[in-house]
Amino acid sequence: MTLFSTERLVLEEFQKKHSKFLLTLVNEPAWLAFIGDKNVHSIEDAEAFIENKFRKSYEESGFGFYVVNLKENGEPVGMCGLVDRNGLEDIDIGFAFLKKYRKMGFGYESSVGMLSYANKELGIEKVVAITHPDNVASGKLLEKLGLSFDKLIQLPEDDKDWCKLYVQNGKPK
């Protein structure tokens, strides 16, 4: 199901057909360094992750992470979405893109669309985001989206790693 489209992108729900793409994305060096190993090491693992995480989130929350495809040819380039994350008071916006599609404005474009969708369709007025402390690029994108660094936090399920918490306090620039 298509969620929305922007000038260059189409966001749709993750499905089994996206397993190969997901397997590639979650095993890229930047994903492993800044997000962590999600134990997705085969097509079967990717299929299970899509079903047990993404599809389950759509059913339980009414939102989740979505595949970001190029409008011109349907090629998946990344993901963007919303998460009701344990340990955060507000809904979390997140994104990740294949290395060859970074620094092309797709993160910004998909996230602006996601913020608009969250507000207009879901009634979510404020979002937050978390990043690895060393993930400078994501921090800059979040600031461009109208979020600002608030503090370092630890999520309940992760007792060793700290995250930067960004809080929405404005509109995208």
Place the predicted regions along the sequence by residue.
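Short, P/G- and charge-enriched loop/turn segments at secondary-structure junctions
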Residues: 53-55, 152-153
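A short helix-loop-beta-strand connector motif used in the catalytic cores of GNAT acetyltransferases and
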Residues: 54-67
